[in-house]
Amino acid sequence: MPKAKTHSGASKRFRRTGTGKIVRQKANRRHLLEHKSSKRTRRLDGRTTVAANDTKRVKSLLNG
């Protein structure tokens, strides 16, 4: 059986932490920011963990 390939789109969007959690960037922070409030853009800053329902699916895309 050939080697399993990592899903290249998922590898660009998700990272695995040292403890095994999967993290992602928050949406709505790329462009058209001038009409979004500073409070909203601060809230969208940084990374967050992937929802528990999605972790199994994302791990399979990342060959885990």
Swiss-Prot record:
Keywords: Ribonucleoprotein, Ribosomal protein. Residues 1-42 have a biased composition (Basic residues). One of its GO terms (molecular function) is structural constituent of ribosome. Signal peptide: none annotated. The keyword Plastid does not apply. The keyword Ribosomal protein applies. Belongs to the bacterial ribosomal protein bL35 family. NCBIfam families: rpmI_bact. This is Large ribosomal subunit protein bL35. The lineage of its organism: Bacteria, Bacillati, Actinomycetota, Actinomycetes, Mycobacteriales.
